[in-house]
């Protein structure tokens, strides 16, 4: 039977954390914001550029920096590292994250926790790969075997080593900056056309603001789906494709109601995302994860 013992003997070519990717995202976001100001708002607004950067990118980055403390309170997470594991499966989580951290050459072990929920969930958060936290739900421990749990944890550790949380925050900041620029343009036009156009300008303001939020969600969701495929692929590489496939198949069985949950609760969310797997057509634009069918198919291609 596959499991942690087999993984210990596996030689892993640890991927280099692509700091160039993070730096590129940051540079592109800052430069694109400057360019948008110059094109759409003119040179006059360039004097507000530093303030705009602080407001647009500061909020998501501060949120990321404080994410560990926030989610610990919100989800009542009990830390199980440093001797806090109470069951065999909790110890499995600690041992797996520890082993993967060593194989991925992380300088600091992520904090590890369990939270009381019937959802089949796990997530990673933190500002960087060396200040991360990985948490799993009690529902996941109750309803997955050793191989499946390892697959899920490898997926979350892939998010950590890829710096996905930071790049998502940068994208959020860019969308926010674009919204602030457009808002300035509309409000400025409203001030310059006070006679008879105030109501129309305000209506335009809300229409464009909502449109920006709408398309921003589509962009963020598309990036998230791409990110999930990447995490699945890396998880399969550092463990074995069968680990990731078994976890995804188990999630598929649970989502389709083909197995009885030990918790007696069919509320389902894969890897800390609500159930979007029944979505189709237009609704797929807002799905943060690819369908389980597509993810399983991608892993099966790796097995060939």
Would you name each region that the model predicts?
Residues 68, 96-101, 224-241:
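An active-site-proximal "capping" alpha-helix that borders the catalytic cofactor pocket
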Residues 68, 97, 122, 136, ...:
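Residue-level signature of catalytic and energy-coupling elements of molecular machines
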Residues 106-131, 195-197, 205-206, 235-304:
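Active-site-proximal gating segments in proteases and membrane effectors
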Residues 119, 135, 151-152, 162:
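Membrane-proximal, non-transmembrane interface segments of integral membrane proteins
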Residues 142-143:
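Alpha-helical transmembrane cores and adjacent cytosolic helix/loop segments
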Residues 153, 157-161, 230, 234:
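Active-site His/Glu-centered metal-binding helix of metallohydrolases
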């Amino acid at each position: 039977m596959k499991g942690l013992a087999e993984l210990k003997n596996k030689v892993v070519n640890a991927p280099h954390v692509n700091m160039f990717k993070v730096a590129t995202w940051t540079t592109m976001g800052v430069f694109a914001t400057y360019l948008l100001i110059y094109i759409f708002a003119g040179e006059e607004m360039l004097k507000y550029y530093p303030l705009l950067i602080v407001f647009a990118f500061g909020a998501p980055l501060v949120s990321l920096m404080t994410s560990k403390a926030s989610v610990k309170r919100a989800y009542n997470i009990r830390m199980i590292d440093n001797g806090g594991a109470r069951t065999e499966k909790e110890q499995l989580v600690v041992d797996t994250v520890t082993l993967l951290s060593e194989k991925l050459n992380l300088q600091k072990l992520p904090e590890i926790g369990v939270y009381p929920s019937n959802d089949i969930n796990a997530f990673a958060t933190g500002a960087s790969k060396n200040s991360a936290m990985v948490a799993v739900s009690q529902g996941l421990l109750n309803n997955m075997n050793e191989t499946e749990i390892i697959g899920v944890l490898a997926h979350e550790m892939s998010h950590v080593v890829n710096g996905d949380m930071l790049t998502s925050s940068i994208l959020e900041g860019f969308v926010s900056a674009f919204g602030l620029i457009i808002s300035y343009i509309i409000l400025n036009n409203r001030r310059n056309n006070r006679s008879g156009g105030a109501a129309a300008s305000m209506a335009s303001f809300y229409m464009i603001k909502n449109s920006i939020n709408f398309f921003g969600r589509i962009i963020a969701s598309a990036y998230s789906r791409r990110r999930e495929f990447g995490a699945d692929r890396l998880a399969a590489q550092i463990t074995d494709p069968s680990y990731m496939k078994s976890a995804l198949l188990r999630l598929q069985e649970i989502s389709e109601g083909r197995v009885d949950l030990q918790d007696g609760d069919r509320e389902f969310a894969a890897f800390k995302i609500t159930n979007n797997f029944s979505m189709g057509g237009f609704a797929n634009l807002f799905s943060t994860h690819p369908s389980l069918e597509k993810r399983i198919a991608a892993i099966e291609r790796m097995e060939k």
